[in-house]
Amino acid sequence: ILANAKTISIGSTGFTKGVLNFINFTQTGSTAQSLLLTGSSQTVIGPATSFGGALTLSSPGVQLNGATFSGTTNITKTGTSNDDGRGGNTFHGISTIINNGTGYLKLGNNNPDVFNADVQFSTTSTGNFYVADNSAGNQFNGNTTFNNTGTGTDVRMMIAENTNATSTFNGDVTINNSGSID
């Protein structure tokens, strides 16, 4: 448990390899958290995890495996790994999730995700982005924006790609594609 008004910080030498796990982790209060990981490191959030405040995370690898995000959430994947998030996440605040890496990023691979406010998904490099990938019952309760500005060939933004996947959009959906697609 992270007490109210406390923060998590990366030390002066950085976090360049290995895995930063937030499993059975609870942040009480609404203090904003900001984490920057580099190199070949990964961040795994969940299961049984909750962030009470805003979260800004930039990490080479990202797996979202069952967490509740109460504040504004900004997550950017920057690395080469292929990351399969199990899903089971609930986002209560406005959220932005970006794949700026060369490996793919999957959300909702086993369990549905719920977005209770506006959400924006973007792929900005050569890695594909799979949203609501392989789970039934994904919910998008605010406005949803999908951006593909990826570079390279065959860069894809995929929504509910697999046969098991279902999604309900209760707000407007905007799709922007200015990337390179074959």
Q: What kind of feature is each model-predicted range?
A:
Residues I1-T90, I94-V114, D118-Q139, N143-T168, ...:
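Extracellular beta-strand-rich, repetitive "passenger/adhesive" scaffolds
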